Amino acid sequence: TPLQYEVDGKKYFNERPTSTQQTGFSYVAQLRSWLPRELGGILWFGNDDGNMIAYVPIYCSNTERAECFNTPGADAVTFSDKNAFWVCNWVSNMVYPRYSQLFPSLKAVRDSLENAYFAAQPEVEAKALSLYKTDKSAAVKYLNDYSIQKSNEMLARWKQLAIYLIVKYNDMAGETGKES
């Protein structure tokens, strides 16, 4: 494998990178024992290459998924622009061959989304904790709705990014002299 190799009879290995083109999904678990279980666990989840996605907050108490992560009709061979895997994969596959040109646009959108999620987290969780003290199910619903909203927001921004990349970097862009 590319992670293990031999040179002059000596064996070497590389650690597996966290961001590779064959990644189907990845997540970062954020676990806080000082919060109630329903609030303390978040999976920062994303479909496709870890460097080319915006991780969205999925609270561990969620009981429903955003449609973009459970899209009827979408599968490994059926594209859907309502499906996060397909849209994120579409964008990544546009970026790979022209990484130095396209990645800065992707990074700007990715960082904008993630920074907004991180900035909102204290307020969102303060509200959830307040709800939790009087109505546990209301707190769970609030976080579930928040996760779905942020998942849908990510998908919408990624679709916009895909269209932007196609228009800005199409093979005619240099000839027209216009930047879209």
Which sequence ranges carry the predicted segments?
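C-terminus-biased signal that marks the final domain/tail of proteins
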Residues: 1-180
